[in-house]
Amino acid sequence: MLGLLDDIVASRSRISVIGSMNVDYTVTAKRLPKPGETVNGGPLTLLPGGKSANQASAAARIGAQVQMFGAVGEDANAAFLLEHLRDAGVDTSHIAAVAGPSGTTVITVDANGENTIVYSAGSNGEVSVDYVQQSSDALVAADVLGLCLESPMETVTACARLCHDAGLKVLLNDSPFVAELPAELIEASDILLVNEHEMAQLLDIAEPDDDDWDGLDWSDVARQMHDFGFNQAVITLGGDGSVVIDGDDIYRIAPVVVEAIDTTGCGDAFMGTVLAGLASGHALSDSAQLASYVSAYAATGFGAQASYGTAAQIRERFGAK
């Protein structure tokens, strides 16, 4: 399976990602606070993040050619974000600079690597439909487009439509979760990526009381997903792997088990890898299987982009698999 990494590099696969770039203000604690509670934490760490920037970085670090689209503010955080994207190998030449602060998140990570995240859009909220139109030639110079919902909905929808009409495969990450997606966005998106809880909310499916997602009727989930408008979807199950719906086929992707230090950004590493796999011509199920390795590697480090591995590092960590 790790041989797919060679294909990603050799194919010179091209990816456009539009969306969020944030500075993550991260603190560790023994446990996450309950509502109204204060707990002691460790030192505050500033790390590069943002769902879209994370996805772009993960794809670039394993060898894909990635263009990032979006906006940073006019503050010290802007240079910090751009520097880290460039270090990962991401093309930042189309990123705009707007007045005001860059995007930020406040993250708390507990001793088990679980986290809570609060997001402040900042410059990400200023990415407009006009910007999409001005960047259209560069946006469509790719094989796939990655989207999340940390940018204005009208901007995301316009970009999806532009790229879909140009023949790109469009992968939509419904996160931060929106239950009622615009019909035009659904129509213009080829693949949906959500976690198990987002899937349950989206399709109004009861979550299993024992958290046994393997006991779910995935054939029924696939039928409902098709009815919703997606013939292809990936449902991530955290540390339990993922499920891929590809037309009439359902694939259960096993997890890659590691001792997690911090799960921040693991879902984004997963999506970035799926983007890279699709851009290099691989099936959705194979791309998701490779993504299990890349996201597992990310869980063994601290932070989002800071924990992402190169193709060589991932091969070394997991061996010939």
Language-model-detected regions and their locations in the chain:
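Short gly/ser/thr-rich secondary-structure transition/capping motifs
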Residues: 88-89, 125-130, 170-177
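A short, aliphatic-rich alpha-helical micro-motif
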Residues: 139-140, 185-186, 227
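Conserved phosphate-binding/catalytic region of the ribokinase-like
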Residues: 2-15, 179, 210-321
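Glycine-rich phosphate/adenosyl-contacting loop at the front of the ribokinase-like
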Residues: 1-71, 76-80, 87, 260-261
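A glycine-rich helix N-cap at a beta->alpha junction
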Residues: 84-99
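Conserved phosphate-binding/catalytic loop of the ribokinase/pfkB sugar-kinase fold
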Residues: 71, 97, 107-144, 149
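Conserved beta-alpha-beta core of the PfkB/ribokinase-like small-molecule kinase fold
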Residues: 144-220, 240-242
